[in-house]
UniProtKB/Swiss-Prot annotation:
Signal peptide: none annotated. GO terms for biological process: glycogen biosynthetic process. Transmembrane segments: none annotated. Monomer. Pathway: Glycan biosynthesis; glycogen biosynthesis. Catalyzes the formation of the alpha-1,6-glucosidic linkages in glycogen by scission of a 1,4-alpha-linked oligosaccharide from growing alpha-1,4-glucan chains and the subsequent attachment of the oligosaccharide to the alpha-1,6 position. This is 1,4-alpha-glucan branching enzyme GlgB. Its EC number is 2.4.1.18. The active site is at D408, E461. Belongs to the glycosyl hydrolase 13 family. GlgB subfamily. It comes from Actinobacillus pleuropneumoniae serotype 3 (strain JL03). Keywords: Carbohydrate metabolism, Glycogen biosynthesis, Glycogen metabolism, Glycosyltransferase, Transferase. It catalyses: Transfers a segment of a (1->4)-alpha-D-glucan chain to a primary hydroxy group in a similar glucan chain. The gene is glgB. GO terms for molecular function: 1,4-alpha-glucan branching enzyme activity; cation binding; hydrolase activity, hydrolyzing O-glycosyl compounds.
Length: 777
C-alpha cells in the first residue's frame, strides 16, 4: 500500500493520538474491517517502519506511515475477523518484533464491571491493578484502574519509555474502569498511570491496587504477582478468641533494631531471625506491626499510606514479608497489622484528585480534609471507595496470613466534628455529628471479615465513649472484636505520675475503669502514642527517684497484667527504655548490659514472667469480659493506696492480685478470701531477681478461718513497697473439705452429748429441787 486516502476517522484519531487525548483507542487501533479488506493500525511515535508478521513469522504486509506523529496503517489482502499477528518495528538503530496490545480483547467480564460499579466485588484486587497473565498464549500484564472522570488514561513505564501516547487504555463507561493487556511486560517492571483529566491536566499516578512499590523517594508501582492465598491455621486463629490469653508486642520495624555500623534498617529476613525468637522468649502471644503499607514519609511511621495493597519496600519484597509472617506462625505467634483507612496523604502521586475530580475524598474540605494531619478523608459513601478499602482487609488476611487488624483513629472516622470547631463541619442527613457512611463501612467490613476472615479479628483504636464498638451490628453495634481502653490507660498513668503521698486523694483513678469494664471487650494499651511528642517514656511517667521509678513501673505492669482485658505493650517498654521513642534510631538495647545497672534487665525479666504467668493461669484471662471473672477484695483502702482483687477461671480456680502504691511495707495486712485452701505467692515485683528490695511472703501463705472484708476466711500478707504480688489459690480438695466437715459434725455431736444431762443427773436435780421447795414452805 503505497498511497493512502485519509478518512475523517483517520484525521480525528491522528489528532487524538498525537495530542494524547484518545479515549477509545481500541475502536481504531489494531485489526479492523475496511470494506472488503482488513486493516491494522499501529501508533508508535518513535518507529520508522512497521511490518505485519503472521504467527509463523511470515511478512503479511508492510505498513505505511501516514502521519509524522507515528501512525502506521497496513492493508491486508483479505478480511479477518481475528488474526494472530505480530509487529516487526524498525527504529533508528534496530528492528525488533513486538506483540500489538490492540489485538487483545478485554479480560474484564460484564459481571466484574457490574460488581465493581456497585461496590460489591468481594475481591476487586483480583481484577484491578497489574496482573501477570497469559492471553492467547502470550505472556504479559493486564492493567486496569478506576478513573471515571478522566479523558484519557495510559499505562506508562520503563517498557514504553514513560510515553503516555503509546499505550492509551480501553474505557468501560459502565464502571469507569480503564484496562489494557500489555504483552511481554515482566515482573519487576516499573509503571504508573498517566491520566489526562477533564481540565486538560496530566496527572502521573501510582496504582492504588499496586502489589509492590518503588523505594522512596521514587514513587512508581512495581509489577509483581498477586500473592497466593495463605492456608489458615485454625489453632492460631483460635488464639484470638476472648477467652484466650492475648499479650501484644507492638513493633515499628524500622526502629526495633538497626545495624550498628550504619544505623540502617534490618530487612524482613533479618527481622524474622531476631524479632520472633525474642518475642517468643518474652512470652508475648501476638505481634502488632505499625503500618507497613507503602508510605512516602518516614516520619509518618506509616500512618499516611499511599499504597494500601503494597507492603513497604523499605525492608524487602512482599514475599519476604510473607516469610516473616510465616515464621511468626511457626513459632506460635499471631500477627496483627495496624490498618489506616481513616485518611490518606496529599502527595501528588497518590489518591488525591486521582482523575482530576475528588474521586476518593470528599470535595468539601469540611468533610474531606483533616486539618490535624494535613491529610484527606475517604468518601466512604462512594461504592468504589468502600470496595477499595473493605476488600483490603480481606487481602491482608487471605494473602499474607495477617491474623488481625488494628484500625487506626476510629474516632476521627465516625465523628464529622472530630477536632473541628462550629462551622467547620457538616452534619449528617439527620443533623447529627456521626459519620453514618463511615459507620456503615466499619460495620459491613467487620461483618465481612467475620464471614470470610477465618477467625481474623479487628481491633478499634477508639478514644471516645461511643457505645457499642464491640457489639454486633445486629445489636446496633459496630462489630469490632476488641477496643483499646484509652480511658483506663489515661487514668492509671495519671495516677502513677503522682507522688505516692498524693495518690490517696485520687484512689478512684485506679478503680473507675471497672465501672464500664463490661461495656466493651477491652485491650489495655501502652502504645507508641504514649512515648512520643514530649509525653516521656512510660518509665519517665513514673514518680520518684530512680529506685522508685523502676519499682513503680514494675508495680504498674503487674496491676495491668492482673486487671481484666487483653494486654498491649509498645517495644522498648518491656525493658523500661528511658527516653522517648525515636523512629529513626534503634531501641536502647545497651541498657540491658552493665550500663543499665541491672534495673532495665529486672523490668525485662518481670515482663517475661508476667507473660508466662498470664498464660499459665486461666483465671487471668478466661473471663476478661464476664463479671464473674473479677471481684474486688480491697477497693477502698485509699489511705494506704492498697488494691486487691481476685481473678477467676471458668473452673473456679483463682489468682489474687495485690498492689501497694506507696513506698511503705504493709506488714500483717489481712485480706478476706472466699474459700479455704493453699495460697502461694507466685509473682512479686519486689523480688531481688527484678532488682527489688526482696520483701515478700516467701511461698505458702496460711489461710485462716477469720472473717475479713465480708469473707469467711482471710490471709495475712507482707505487701512490699511499690509492688504488685500475685497469689494463686489452690482450694482444698473436695474430699479434704468433706472430711473436715465430718470432723466438725462429729465434734458438734460430741459437744451436744457432753452437754446433755443424764438420768442420774436429772434425778439428783429433781430431789434437790423438791427439798428446796419443802424448806421454802
Amino acid at each position: 500500500m503505497k498511497t493512502y486516502t485519509y478518512s475523517k476517522q483517520d484525521l480525528s484519531f491522528i489528532e487524538q493520538l498525537s495530542q494524547a487525548y484518545c479515549k477509545d483507542p481500541f475502536s481504531y487501533l489494531g485489526l479492523h474491517q475496511a470494506g472488503d479488506v482488513s486493516v491494522i493500525r499501529v501508533f508508535l511515535p518513535e518507529a520508522t517502519t512497521v511490518k505485519i508478521l503472521s504467527a509463523d513469522g511470515q511478512i503479511l504486509s508492510e505498513a505505511l506511515k501516514i502521519d509524522d506523529s507515528g501512525l502506521f496503517v497496513a492493508q491486508l489482502s483479505q478480511q479477518y475477523s481475528s488474526l494472530n499477528y505480530r509487529l516487526r518495528v524498525g527504529y533508528s538503530l534496530a528492528e525488533i518484533d513486538l506483540e500489538d496490545p490492540y489485538r487483545f480483547t478485554s479480560s474484564l467480564l460484564p459481571m466484574d464491571n457490574w460488581l465493581l460499579a456497585e461496590g460489591t466485588h468481594l475481591r476487586p484486587y483480583e481484577i484491578l491493578g497489574a496482573h501477570l497473565k497469559t492471553q492467547e498464549g502470550v505472556s504479559g500484564v493486564h492493567f486496569s484502574v478506576w478513573a471515571p472522570n478522566a479523558r484519557r488514561v495510559s499505562v506508562v513505564g520503563d517498557f514504553n519509555y514513560w510515553d503516555g501516547r503509546v499505550n492509551p487504555m480501553r474505557f468501560h463507561a459502565e464502571s469507569g474502569i480503564w484496562d489494557i493487556f500489555l504483552p511481554n511486560v515482566e515482573k519487576g517492571a516499573l509503571y504508573k498511570f498517566e491520566i489526562l483529566d477533564s481540565n486538560g491536566n496530566i496527572r502521573l499516578k501510582s496504582d492504588p491496587y499496586a502489589f509492590a512499590s518503588q523505594f522512596r523517594p521514587d514513587t512508581a508501582s512495581v509489577v509483581t504477582g498477586l500473592p497466593e492465598k495463605i492456608e489458615v491455621d485454625a489453632k492460631l486463629r483460635h488464639a484470638n478468641e476472648p477467652d484466650q490469653p492475648i499479650s501484644i508486642y507492638e513493633v515499628h520495624l524500622g526502629s526495633w533494631r538497626r545495624h550498628l555500623e550504619n544505623n540502617y534498617w534490618l530487612n524482613y529476613e533479618e527481622i524474622a531471625n531476631e524479632l520472633i525468637p525474642y518475642v517468643k522468649d518474652m512470652g508475648f502471644t501476638h505481634i502488632e506491626l505499625l503500618p507497613i503499607t507503602e508510605y512516602p514519609f518516614d516520619g509518618s511511621w506509616g500512618y499516611q499510606p499511599t499504597g494500601l495493597y503494597s507492603p513497604t519496600s523499605r525492608f524487602g519484597s512482599p514475599d519476604d514479608l510473607r516469610t516473616l509472617i510465616r515464621k511468626a506462625h511457626e513459632a506460635g505467634i499471631n500477627v496483627i497489622l495496624d490498618w489506616v483507612v481513616g485518611h490518606f496523604p496529599t502527595d501528588s502521586h497518590g489518591l488525591t484528585e486521582f482523575d482530576g475530580s475528588h474521586l476518593y475524598e470528599h470535595q468539601d474540605p469540611r468533610e474531606g480534609y483533616h486539618q490535624d494531619w494535613n491529610t484527606l478523608i475517604f468518601n466512604y459513601g462512594r461504592h468504589e471507595v468502600f470496595n477499595y478499602l473493605s476488600s483490603n482487609a480481606l487481602y491482608w488476611t487471605e494473602r499474607f496470613g495477617i491474623d488481625g487488624l488494628r484500625v487506626d483513629a476510629v474516632s476521627s472516622m465516625i465523628y464529622r466534628d472530630y477536632s473541628r470547631k462550629d462551622g467547620e463541619w457538616i452534619p449528617n442527613q439527620y443533623g447529627g455529628r456521626e459519620n453514618l457512611e463511615a459507620l456503615d463501612f466499619l460495620r459491613r467490613t467487620n461483618r465481612m471479615l467475620k464471614k470470610e476472615g477465618h477467625g481474623a479479628v479487628v481491633i478499634a483504636e477508639e478514644s471516645t465513649s461511643f457505645a457499642g464498638i464491640t457489639h454486633s451490628p445486629t445489636e446496633n453495634g459496630v462489630g469490632f472484636d476488641y477496643k483499646w481502653n484509652m480511658g483506663w490507660m489515661n487514668d492509671t498513668l495519671r495516677y502513677m505520675s503522682l507522688d505516692p503521698i498524693y495518690r490517696q486523694y485520687h484512689h478512684d483513678w485506679m478503680t473507675f475503669g471497672m465501672m464500664y469494664q463490661y461495656s466493651e471487650k477491652f485491650v489495655l494499651p501502652l502504645s507508641h502514642d504514649e512515648v512520643v511528642h514530649g509525653k516521656c517514656s512510660i518509665l519517665g511517667k513514673m514518680s520518684g527517684d530512680c529506685w522508685q521509678k523502676f519499682a513503680n513501673l514494675r508495680a504498674y505492669y503487674g496491676y495491668m497484667w492482673g486487671y481484666p482485658g487483653k494486654k498491649l505493650l509498645f517495644m522498648g517498654n518491656e525493658f523500661a527504655q528511658g527516653r522517648e521513642w525515636n523512629y529513626n534510631e534503634s531501641l536502647d538495647w545497651f541498657l540491658l548490659g552493665e550500663q543499665g545497672g541491672g534495673w532495665h534487665k529486672g523490668v525485662l525479666n518481670w515482663v517475661r514472667d508476667l507473660n508466662r504467668t498470664y498464660q499459665k493461669y486461666p483465671a487471668l484471662y478466661q473471663l476478661d469480659y464476664d463479671p464473674a471473672g473479677f471481684e474486688w477484695l480491697v477497693v477502698d483502702d485509699w489511705q494506704q493506696s492498697v488494691f486487691a482483687f481476685e481473678r477467676k477461671a471458668k473452673n473456679g480456680e483463682s489468682v489474687i492480685v495485690v498492689s501497694n502504691f506507696t513506698p511503705v511495707v504493709r506488714h500483717n495486712y489481712r485480706i478476706g478470701v472466699r474459700q479455704d485452701g493453699t495460697y502461694t505467692e507466685i509473682l512479686n515485683s519486689d523480688a531481688a531477681y527484678y532488682e527489688g528490695s526482696n520483701v515478700g511472703n516467701y511461698g505458702e501463705i496460711e489461710c485462716e478461718a477469720i472473717e475479713s472484708h465480708g469473707k469467711p476466711f482471710s490471709i495475712e500478707l507482707s505487701i512490699p513497697p511499690l509492688s504488685t504480688i500475685f497469689i494463686a489459690c489452690q482450694p482444698k480438695p473436695k474430699e479434704a473439705v468433706e472430711a473436715e466437715q465430718d470432723i466438725v459434725k462429729m465434734a458438734e455431736v460430741a459437744m451436744q452429748k457432753a452437754l446433755k444431762p443424764t438420768k442420774k443427773t436429772v434425778s439428783v436435780k429433781a430431789k434437790a429441787h423438791k427439798k428446796a421447795h419443802k424448806n421454802k414452805k
